[in-house]
Amino acid sequence: MSAPADNQARDEPLLVARQLSKWYGRQLGCRDVSFELYPGEVLAIVGESGSGKTTLLQLLSCQLAADAGEALYRTRDGALRDLAQLGEAERRFLFRTDWGYVHQDPALGLRMSISAGGNVGERLMAVGWRRYGAIRSAAAEWLDRVEIDRSRIDDPPRTYSGGMRQRLQIARNLVTNPRLVFMDEPTGGLDASVQARLLDLLRGLVGELHLAAVIVTHDLAVARLLSHRIMVMKGGEAIEQGLTDQVLDDPHAPYTQLLVSSILPA
């Protein structure tokens, strides 16, 4: 994916990781991971199972506490805040307003027993919307944007296909115009045709909404299509990072070379 159109030199980073580290007892989760993410930029974190990419995503999204290092987020007032120093109420506020989180399993990010419109509307109510007509109208518009027929607005997601559930989860996350979205294997477990449709949708929305995103994926084709920058992880460490096309077309680390040659078509 080509770089964002905006000149990043004029922006300040939205999310900063400085030597983030996490252990599970004696087992390393990740160690000394550092990067900066700018507004409108998408970072893909790739690597095989157990490489540390999911641990890193959980650290960045405040689901785990780091053992060393820090994760900093630039709030809307321009302050760069240490996420570890935020109270629980402040973190919940971030997830309601500034952040989204797209799970690999949509059931983790949706309420399966309430309607699709209710799932989207809940996010709006959490940021202060109160008029039923406006909430329902916004939910219907977002169903359109994620290519779900409006006639399904009153159906619960348990009646949806896997691809539809994932698109609904995306609508639920993006309806409040977040600045940063975390995605954990967003296309995992989907058939190839469904995955391709979802990728096209995600790519369009990320560009249209000028979203910053951190995407964990094992699929280098997904990373190439969606991300501006890529980080390759192995054994809990970031062994290579840079512009996605440059890293995938000319990998320097031996492990990255192996990963690219074994997964990407010649």
Segments (PLM) and residue ranges:
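The feature captures the beta-strand-to-loop junction immediately N-terminal to the Walker
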Residues: 46-48
